[in-house]
Design a protein with these regions (language model features):
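Short intrinsically disordered terminal tails
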Residues: 1-10, 84, 105-108
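Alpha-helix boundary/N-cap detector
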Residues: 3, 7-10, 14, 33, ...
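Short alpha-helical segments that sit at the start of domains
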Residues: 10-50
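Short acidic, hydrophobic short linear motifs in intrinsically disordered regions
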Residues: 48-65
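Short amphipathic alpha-helical interaction segments
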Residues: 69-85
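Short, cationic-aromatic polyanion-contact patches
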Residues: 94-108
Length: 108
């Protein structure tokens, strides 16, 4: 069984505050941009299916992020874990049977 990242409400609030500051230019970095791009990509992919889920390949997520370092394919799933911990997506299953669902609109 895979252990999912679980954040307290306080940790979620702090992380969202950080992401909003990064969005507003108060903090320099690309972390927020990567999460946002991945969320938008997943939202588009999920909208194409009847059950509202998607299961993109890791390299597809990297391309959506604008990254060409395909040897770092784990990054897509790392960012998915972060989005899930913040309650923006839900992941079910594993491997080729994994399903990703959008659970709420992005607000950072």
């Amino acid at each position: 069984m895979i252990k999912k990242k679980v954040l307290t409400q306080e940790q979620i609030s702090e992380k969202l505050d950080y992401l909003r500051k990064q969005r507003d230019g108060l903090i320099v970095g690309d972390y927020r941009n990567y999460l946002y791009k991945l969320y938008m990509y997943l939202k588009e992919r999920c909208s194409e299916t009847e059950d509202g889920s998607c299961n993109p390949y890791p390299w597809q997520m990297l391309v959506a992020l604008g990254r060409d370092d395909l040897h770092k394919s784990y990054l897509g799933y790392t960012y998915c874990d972060d989005l899930e911990a913040l309650d923006y997506i839900k992941m079910q299953g594993y491997g080729k049977d994994k399903k990703i669902f959008i659970t709420k609109e992005i607000d950072f």
